[in-house]
């Protein structure tokens, strides 16, 4: 959150938003801080897409530094192409709830990392391809349920209001 707060949040919406963003025009209960937390979750989602691709290929401290740079600098820059009135917005680009901005950015960042890092250690041997099995099915199942239930709030927030007729 610190990288996104320090530089990314304002940069995503262009130079007119460097100090305070007026979100009350949409909904009086939707404050700048509410929008900041919501957009920070989008930025974190882009970083988690990369984390899944580089798992077991990088050390945690190196990934944390990378994630701060990704979330604080690269993601807001790419987000400003659409949300900040950038060239994509000028071309009439439609992106409901940031699905393309978040997932395409995360996917391309993950692809770039995988190209640089190469395959996981031990995946390819002289005898051919060695399968690397999952480590913890209970943890994987917990992750699926957390993602499943968390997505309801995430997608509901995408319409900037918690009203049933908007999120259905």
Outline where the language-model segments fall.
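Hydrophobic alpha-helical transmembrane bundles of multi-pass membrane proteins
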Residues: 1-168
């Amino acid at each position: 959150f610190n990288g996104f707060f320090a530089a990314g949040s304002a940069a995503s919406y262009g130079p007119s938003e460097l100090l305070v963003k007026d979100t009350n025009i949409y909904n009086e209960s939707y404050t700048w801080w509410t929008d900041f937390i919501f957009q920070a979750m989008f930025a974190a989602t882009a970083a988690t897409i990369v984390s899944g691709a580089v798992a077991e290929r990088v050390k945690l401290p190196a990934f944390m530094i990378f994630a701060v740079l990704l979330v604080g600098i690269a993601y807001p820059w790419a987000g400003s192409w659409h949300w900040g009135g950038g060239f994509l917005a000028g071309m009439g680009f439609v992106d409901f709830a940031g699905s393309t901005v978040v997932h395409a950015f995360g996917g391309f960042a993950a692809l770039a990392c995988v190209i640089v890092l190469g395959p996981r250690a031990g995946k390819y041997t002289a005898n051919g391809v060695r399968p690397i099995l999952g480590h913890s099915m209970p943890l994987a199942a917990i992750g699926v349920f957390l993602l499943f239930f968390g997505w309801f709030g995430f997608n509901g927030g995408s319409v900037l209001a918690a009203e049933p007729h908007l999120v259905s």
